[in-house]
From Swiss-Prot:
CDD domains for the chain: corrinoid_protein_B12-BD
InterPro entries, A to Z: Cbl-bd_cap, Cobalamin-bd, Cobalamin-bd_sf, Corrinoid_p, Dimeth_corrin_MtbC, Met_Synthase/Corrinoid, Meth_synthase_dom
GO biological process entries: methanogenesis
Family to which this protein belongs: Belongs to the methylamine corrinoid protein family.
Organism phylogeny: Archaea, Methanobacteriati, Methanobacteriota, Stenosarchaea group, Methanomicrobia
Chain ranges of the B12-binding N-terminal domain: 1-91
Protein name: Dimethylamine corrinoid protein 2
Length: 216
């Protein structure tokens, strides 16, 4: 019988391999000795973390990321189907995530959404080229704890500031945290516009979200 560490390693490796059948086999084996939350967080999400890192380094490409995310969803679905009726996995918080108006880049933001979801957050990904007011309207609708704002061009970064200003106008700024990211964004920019945090990559986005919303 494989040890827990070996099972978790295989779950992670299976995600990185982007092979759905391998992920499903690893989940089937792991669920005999582990709780679903542990399988997701320490196995599947760890693998997705690795995928995010490899993508950022140019070692994996978008099709790999999408296949890995699809494989992870298949694994999570198996675990959710086995939970007793009425059992709900506790969500760590509600996050609205999107790419600001004028910016059609989607890849990094999609990876962040996948990673946040796999870490246990309820994520509402509202896509790319999103008008400023839509972020705030969606945050109201779903009672969001945080808004994630991605901008991949210097010309669209201003949209991140505009969302924060609109949150203030709507009297929501105290309650809703704001995370910014994207190639031109920096910690200095986040400080300048009054964002709560800046995340350089998907793994950091998860860590910062936990830190801000859970104090972890």
């Amino acid at each position: 019988m494989a040890s827990k560490e070996e099972l978790l390693q295989e779950l992670s490796d299976a995600i990185v391999s982007c092979k759905k059948d391998r992920v499903i086999a690893a989940v089937e084996k792991a669920k005999e000795v582990m709780e679903p939350a542990e399988i997701i967080e320490k196995g599947l999400a760890a693998g997705m973390n690795q995928v995010g890192t490899l993508f950022e380094r140019g070692k994996l490409f978008l099709p790999h990321v999408m296949m890995a995310a699809d494989s992870m969803t298949a694994g999570v679905n198996i675990l959710e189907a086995e939970m007793p009726a009425g059992t709900e996995t506790k969500k760590l918080g509600v996050i609205v995530n999107g790419t600001v108006e004028g910016d059609v880049h989607d890849i990094g933001k999609s990876i962040v959404s996948t990673m946040l979801q796999s870490a246990g957050f309820e994520v509402h990904d509202i896509g790319r080229d999103v008008p400023i007011k839509n972020f705030v309207e969606k945050a109201k609708e779903v009672n969001a704890d945080m808004i994630g704002l991605s901008a991949l061009m210097t010309t669209t970064m201003q949209g991140q500031r505009d969302v924060i200003e609109l949150l203030k106008e709507e009297g929501m700024r105290e309650r809703v945290k704001v995370m910014v990211g994207g190639a031109p964004a920096t910690q200095a920019w986040a400080d300048k516009i009054g964002a709560d945090c800046y995340a350089e990559n998907a793994s950091e986005a998860v860590a910062k979200a936990k830190e801000l919303l859970l104090g972890k």
